[in-house]
């Protein structure tokens, strides 16, 4: 992976435009920041706030000026309480300053003033925990996400909506049929596409589609937005799986690796080499 200059955010650019530029400049790769207790142990770090901080600082220092996207998993920071959230704030801030796009993996979903508060927490520029984009759950109805989508639009942020997840329990809900014959997942896909319909380049409302879902027959062709693809590497998905799944979506797919890269720490060169291998595999599969 060759070093690329940072991709600075611009208030005049939408999230979709910034993401597309980052993927073009640095290649189609997102690296998750998932400080599992087992990973901390593997790195020789204590399962504590100090271990969490050392882990996150090392990953950001090694990769944030090289990869297009990084994705901290909020839960692994939250488990340490306020001190862990403080580390998360610092991690997001440092990663963004280094030029990578940060998607906060929080999977929040609620209604009314509560979801509005989540939107302000994760997407308002005045929030200490603000990221470039956030993952959300639509299972209180897609319309419940309106405050998050509005907040994102107001500040040039992005939203990634869970659509087709790779956990075995997912299909019982996501593949269920609605009254008009579409699956629940297809209604989510179509609602996201409607949000992006007027975007001049790439819309800022994306979807989360697991790498291991297989060919489900869902139609993403009208999305005009990015697709975040977790589940690659240690979770069982392979880069080659994306060839069939996303054959009509080249250039907007954001493949995400976590343990497959993170397990090669704590040395920075090991992390960089693993990220290089993951990026090479994704480029071969998507181009």
PLM region descriptions:
Residues 3-72, 77-90, 94-103, 180, ...:
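Conserved N-terminal beta1-alpha1 strand-loop-helix module at the mouth
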Residues 25-29, 65-68, 98-100, 130-132, ...:
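Short, well-ordered coil/turn segments that N-cap beta-strands
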Residues 37, 106-206:
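Conserved anion-binding
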Residues 207, 211-256, 260-261:
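A C-terminal functional module that forms or caps the active site or interfaces directly
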Residues 23-24, 60-66, 92-97, 149-155, ...:
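Acidic (Asp/Glu)-rich catalytic clusters
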Residues 34-38, 75-77, 107-111, 137-139, ...:
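Active-site beta-loop-alpha junctions enriched in small/polar residues
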Residues 31, 70, 105, 134, ...:
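Conserved, mostly hydrophobic/aromatic
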Residues 79-94, 111-116, 140-153, 212-220, ...:
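Active-site-adjacent beta->alpha loops and helix N-cap segments on the catalytic face
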């Amino acid at each position: 992976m060759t070093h690329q200059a940072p991709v600075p955010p611009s208030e005049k650019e939408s999230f979709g435009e910034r993401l597309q530029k980052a993927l073009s400049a640095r290649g189609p790769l997102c690296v998750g920041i998932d400080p599992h207790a087992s990973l901390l142990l593997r790195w020789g770090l204590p399962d504590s706030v100090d271990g969490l901080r050392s882990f996150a600082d090392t990953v950001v220092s090694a990769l944030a000026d090289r990869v297009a996207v990084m994705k901290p998993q909020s839960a692994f920071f939250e488990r340490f309480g306020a001190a862990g959230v403080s580390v998360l704030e610092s991690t997001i801030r440092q990663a963004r300053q280094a030029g990578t796009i940060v998607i906060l993996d929080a999977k929040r979903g609620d209604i009314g003033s509560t979801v509005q508060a989540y939107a302000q927490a994760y997407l308002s520029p005045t929030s200490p925990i603000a990221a470039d984009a956030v993952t959300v759950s639509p299972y209180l109805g897609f319309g419940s996400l309106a405050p998050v989508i509005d907040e994102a639009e107001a500040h040039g942020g992005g939203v990634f909506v869970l659509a087709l997840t790779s956990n075995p329990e997912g299909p019982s809900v996501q593949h269920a049929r609605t009254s008009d014959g579409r699956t629940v997942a297809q209604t989510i896909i179509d609602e996201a596409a409607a949000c992006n319909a007027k975007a001049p380049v790439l819309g800022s409302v994306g979807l989360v589609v697991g790498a291991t879902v297989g060919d489900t027959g869902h139609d993403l062709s009208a999305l005009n937005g990015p697709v975040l693809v977790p589940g690659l590497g240690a979770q069982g998905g392979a880069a080659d799986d994306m060839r069939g799944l996303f054959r009509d979506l080249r250039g907007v797919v954001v493949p995400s690796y976590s343990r497959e890269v993170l397990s090669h720490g704590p040395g920075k060169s090991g992390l960089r080499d693993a990220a290089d291998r993951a990026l090479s595999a994704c480029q071969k599969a998507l181009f």
